[in-house]
Curated annotation (Swiss-Prot):
This is Quinolinate synthase. It is an enzyme of class 2 (transferase). Pathway: Cofactor biosynthesis; NAD(+) biosynthesis; quinolinate from iminoaspartate: step 1/1. Keywords: 4Fe-4S, Cytoplasm, Iron, Iron-sulfur, Metal-binding, Pyridine nucleotide biosynthesis, Transferase. The keyword Magnesium does not apply. Belongs to the quinolinate synthase family. Type 2 subfamily. Pfam families: NadA. It is found in: Cytoplasm. The lineage of its organism: Bacteria, Pseudomonadati, Chlorobiota, Chlorobiia, Chlorobiales. Its cofactor is [4Fe-4S] cluster.
Length: 322
């Protein structure tokens, strides 16, 4: 296995600087706000107005007074922003940037699954389609899943989907059973303890921090488990000088930016598993971000009836996580 190296912030070339200036000008002209997830490339994060995890970005989308929302993320995120702001223009740099986790839970199959447990409350991860959100009672994110489930009476059955690893983590934290949909994020599923242990041996003083979408075998060895936002906050306040980070490596940019004196090592992936980079997030580029502001396309459109159903479960999440 190739020796791992701590993350360094990449330099910005002249073309990226020119694009950044043009994006900033177009943003002012359009009265737009640019929201970007931590997993996007550093250049995107540098020009964004808000960089955050799913919950932070949903809140930013809900409260903005901008006329145009540009969402650099994957499709369900732009869709959520449109559901929260039906009267605003919502753009995505590339609306073909989907989420395999969300796609692993088709609405018709999930509906049939739900019908097997008619008395169950449905809590769905925000990494899901508008159709699934409309089928759900409450939405959650990785940062508030434990808190939201903890507010449900212990005698109430819960269906949790689509991420089985996040669901399993919530079950372990609260010592309660839930009925899990068997979906997963291919990035986080790619981490195994056998491989990460090699990084731990290479960096014995580093803390292992992991996202709850990782498998249990990884979480059981982690010094801290949390959403991307929580991992970022922990890396800032922890006295540790080095961290092995088991989540999509886009977060390393913000970690290094906030704590330049610390070392951040992307956790190695299982060599027999899928890649540990979210290729869909990387479809957001400076070129297509600039182009979407220039052409005001592609725009996100959500059916009004579907949006109304999905809005109820999203609003419930926001109410329960204040």
């Amino acid at each position: 296995m190739t020796a791992l190296q701590p993350y360094t912030i990449p330099s910005q070339d002249d073309r990226q600087s020119v694009l950044a200036d043009k994006i900033k000008r177009l943003r002012e002209e359009r009265n737009a706000i640019i929201l970007a997830h931590y997993y996007t490339v550093p250049e995107i994060q540098q020009v964004a107005d808000v960089v955050g995890d799913s919950l932070a970005l949903a809140r930013a989308a809900e409260t903005t007074d901008a006329d145009v929302i540009v969402f650099a993320g994957v499709y369900f995120m732009g869709e959520t922003a449109k559901i929260l702001n039906p009267g605003k223009t919502v753009l995505m740099p590339d609306n073909s940037a989907g989420c395999p986790l969300a796609d692993s839970c088709p609405a018709d199959r999930f509906r049939s699954f739900r019908e097997q447990y008619p008395d169950a409350l449905v809590i769905s991860y925000i990494n899901s389609t508008a159709e699934i959100k409309a089928e759900s009672d409450i939405i959650c994110t990785s940062s508030n899943a434990v808190d939201i489930v903890s507010q449900i009476p212990s005698d109430k059955r819960i269906i949790f989907g689509p991420d089985r690893n996040l669901g399993s983590y919530v079950m372990q934290q609260l010592e309660r059973e839930m009925i899990l949909w068997q979906g997963f994020c291919y990035v986080h599923e790619s981490y195994s303890w056998d491989v990460i242990e090699t990084a731990v041996r290479q960096f014995p003083d580093a803390q292992l921090i992991a996202h709850p979408e990782c498998r249990r075998e990884v979480l059981d060895h982690a010094d801290f488990v949390g959403s991307t936002g929580a991992l970022l906050a922990y890396s800032q306040k922890s006295p540790a000088d080095a961290f092995i980070v088991a989540t999509e490596p886009g977060i390393l940019y913000e970690m290094k930016k906030r704590s330049p004196e610390k070392s951040f090592i992307a956790a190695p992936k299982d060599i027999v598993s899928s890649q540990s980079v979210c290729s869909q997030m990387k479809q957001n580029t400076m070129e297509n971000l600039c182009n979407c502001l220039e052409t005001m396309a592609p725009q996100i459109v959500v059916d009004e009836t579907l949006a109304a159903g999905a809005l109820k479960s999203i609003r419930k999440m926001l109410e329960m996580s204040k």
